[in-house]
């Protein structure tokens, strides 16, 4: 097979030589094949720019070059210079000037790498001027001219040694175009682009007149040594300079960015440390098992020691001792608080209407502040701290470069359309996906054109607003037309023209003729997006109608590698200018986006059978968050109603059917709910007076949260009032006061703990969470105060109504005389007393409970180490939001991450040579310059999260100044003398270059830098000068009035970022890179010590918090434990043991909650942190009541006191705490907002369930083992109270006994009168009480 191929090649070469014999009869050293110019190629009608003249056929000896001709040859083709007297060439002065002009376009791209530029020039100098031209050139086609004139050469063959050509190609293969963040060979290799380019394809493109730049056809033959050749042909094998070697004393080697061989050895970043293992077990799991085992063993030892101690104590029990001093101190807080609240409750109950009026006035006065409320809906203002580093960086960026443009984006995939094969004449057989079908493209073109021509009426502007009024127009920002607007899509490869999309043509390539159409042009443009004229017979441009390239990763998605034809999705992106919030153009942009969304919704509905469409506007996220907030308000209203109904029903004591209307508590329940709402409104109004902005999240969640807490207190208070019988001769007001003195310390303990936890939660810098925490903390305090005033007054009035046997709600009507309540024990109390408490505290069950809970604690310690940190933005959306599909498509199909800008602040001298060398990446720049470090980082995208190296205005500015390009020129005469002459001006008046020619890298002086930089930033790029900076850098450099660079930015791209963890790590990695760059640039002479480089990505403001949320959360939660313990310790009577057990239970609830968060898919972030802070406060509700009940019990043994607390306070906690939380929480599960569902429904459900389990299961068992000893002072006081109770009481006619002393006794729950210290403890029943 190989022999046959070589034979065919030899035959082809011989045939070619035979055909060309007429034009190149001699192949000898020192003989030319053509010489002098013969005008334009008559076979070409025109090109992208003015084409060079072709040469005349001339089989003559090479000419001796002297004088100006020699100087010109030495300057343009230095490798052909052999000295002043021995230099021969085959080109005239005109040919040299034409050669220089024709190479200027390509040299502008390659000049940043001197070796590449020189090698490229050398190739064409040899072709045109080599004195041995006939040895490797064979003319194959000429065009006859007039009589007596030599023919014009329009095609020839060039024979090169393959190694020679490949070395030349290798020297240029890595040269970059900074503005496009791509390789220069990508625009010099035709349909193959940079990915498929090689030496043969690179040379073929240069010799193809179809590219619009070549004046004649050149066929390049790359031959191996020893390969058969036509007679006389000797393949060119000239000098090729490696890119990592200097070309002279003053020239610099190519930089690492343009030449891999110049790169220093960059050690790869350290691999991620493997997980810590102990044997085959993960280290965390092993350590937690060891810790849990030690904890269980320690607990078992403590329990055993306590049991032995109790036995010894029982054996040695003698006469009862007098209370010790510590016990008296423990009693003191009980007594003080109990007496205070008893007196307070009695006074409030005595003046109910006055207290209600004063409470109403205070609430109204505070709530009036809501007239000044500022509702924040901007996601940036809600979820990013105003003083955070990311916000400061955003402010700096927006101030100096303007806000990041507004993105309106569409993803489209095909339904039920299978892929197909296409035999491309250019690239062979290719797979095309279903979405890449002509009928689909035509339909999407219609959609795109409808969107481009959208107009919407603006009341403020009193005219129609169109896209051109607000669009981002990089090449014409000042006088924008519709075709100047930046719209990126595959359709831009056809300039949004239906005729061009449907164009077809016949083309012959390598002897094969085939029809070429849009698919061939698409393949060409996807591989070479910088092409101005493709190599097909269609001869279409790949540039968008607004003048910039469309890179395939921005136009299609869902492909592998560079197989763009297999893309599953098409992407259309409309980029709009962004404006400050108070700019009237911002409202215009939002109006256009509103019309854009309506058009897309209509298109999605009408084409649902063909397309799957996902879309988003810049305003979409804010709109959807606001929409779901409004939609979910009824859910919260239903939650309120259910809690209200439960309270109203549960607070009643229904002893007889005939007394239901009287014993109902609907009015009291409604009053309790109104008290909670009043507290919330007052808290929000107070902060509105202070100018603290609020949010819709606060309006939704805070009332629900405070209702859950407030309902607990209401239930416990009323239930205690019903259970605590009125003493003989005791007035209603005194009865209420005594009840309040009994339960208010527990209510104070819980409310104070929760409020402190919320205020500590306000330490988080996230505005929405901080405001939520502040409002919740104040609302809980106000709720407690209103419960101590307004609700006590309501209870007094309700008790008066009930004693008068008036029906609830319709209290103005009196009823007939009703029978007294029937004595009956409630089902809940009976269940706890007869079944639950005996089972839980059985001697075999208690160790099992301890073991299970400690095992659960250990398992959740491990699970909490695996919780995800972050908050994906789609979770802030409702479940039915169209943005859910958009974010799904964005993560699935977009093949590049967001742009990241490395921003430089003021204080760095870019105009100095040292400053330029420290930031650029071309020849002469430092190996560890700013842009070079970003390049190194992009080689390790998995660690640096940078995938595409940065564009560099410094590099392109230097290239723009290079004399060999046609970019920076000056008028030499006329009124604009010495002013900038644009590259589009081809007159002889623009022959003066801005910079003089030098052997080394071009570096302007400070004066030249400040003069030429504004010209560069306003020069539009074009085919003659692709380095113009208007499109890429107009907004990237901020200049002061005297021309100093006060801020600039270098744009790179992240790799695709799929979730919040990726965004967080990308921010962390880019900051580390920027800090490293900053440290080096501060060493440049003249740099301000405060100079800084920082990374800016539009999403940084949202993900900044996740860099520190973990340590901040640990600190905040640990800080919450301190006041919780202190408050419990103080209000439990300076009882250290009770305080520690209380704290232990709360810590276990918290750890179990976090561990189960990982199981249920709840990530850790500022929203869940504030809920965990809430968990600490709510845990107090579940454990503190029972702990306090145990601490004040006078039963002789811990087991009896644990049973006592479980039966009476445990049942109250279940009915009053858990059952008031569950209805409201379960309703949250119906909310549309995923944020509410996940972080409020799921998390609060976990908190409530775990709090209930630890409070009613674990805590009684722990107290039965490790609880504090009985308080002897309390026992003594109870004994004295009992003795006083049996003594005869003096008559007091001023306060006669009520007629119906038991009218307000709830016999469904209440025991007989409990003997105990007045207002020092709850009415906990004795063992001999009757029910």
From Swiss-Prot:
Principal location listed in the UniProt entry: membrane
Tissue specificity remark: Small intestine showed the highest level of expression. Expression in other tissues including gall bladder, liver, testis and stomach is also observed. Along the duodenum-ileum axis, the levels vary in different segments of the intestine with peak expression in the proximal jejunum. Protein expression is confined to the enterocyte. Discrete localization to the epithelial layer bordering the luminal space along the crypt-villus axis. Protein expression in the enterocyte is observed closest to the luminal space.
Matching PROSITE patterns: SSD
One cellular component (GO) term of this entry: apical plasma membrane
Positions of transmembrane segments: 283-303, 353-373, 633-653, 666-686, 697-717, 743-763, 777-797, 847-867, 1114-1134, 1143-1163, 1166-1186, 1207-1227, 1243-1263
Catalysis performed (reactions): cholesterol(in) = cholesterol(out); sitosterol(out) = sitosterol(in)
UniProt-recorded Gene Ontology molecular function terms: cholesterol binding; heterocyclic compound binding; lipid transporter activity; myosin V binding; protein homodimerization activity; small GTPase binding; vitamin E binding
Location in or out of the cell: Apical cell membrane; Cell membrane
Family annotation (InterPro entries): HMGCR/SNAP/NPC1-like_SSD (IPR053958), NPC1-like (IPR004765), NPC1_MLD (IPR053956), NPC1_N (IPR032190), SSD (IPR000731)
Signal peptide per UniProt: 1-20
Gene3D superfamilies reported in the protein's UniProt record: Multidrug efflux transporter AcrB transmembrane domain
Membrane topology, record value: Multi-pass membrane protein
Domain (SSD): residue spans on this chain: 632-797
Post-translational modification: Highly glycosylated.
Segments on the Cytoplasmic face: 304-352, 654-665, 718-742, 798-846, 1135-1142, 1187-1206, 1264-1331
Homology family: Belongs to the patched family.
Biological function: Plays a major role in cholesterol homeostasis. Critical for the uptake of cholesterol across the plasma membrane of the intestinal enterocyte. Involved in plant sterol absorption, it transports sitosterol, although at lower rates than cholesterol. Is the direct molecular target of ezetimibe, a drug that inhibits cholesterol absorption and is approved for the treatment of hypercholesterolemia. May have a function in the transport of multiple lipids and their homeostasis, thereby influencing lipid metabolism regulation. May be involved in caveolin trafficking from the plasma membrane.
Subunit structure: Interacts with RAB11A, MYO5B and RAB11FIP2. Interaction with RAB11A, MYO5B and RAB11FIP2 is required for proper transport to the plasma membrane upon cholesterol depletion. Interacts with NPC2. Interacts with LIMA1.
Protein name (Swiss-Prot/TrEMBL): NPC1-like intracellular cholesterol transporter 1
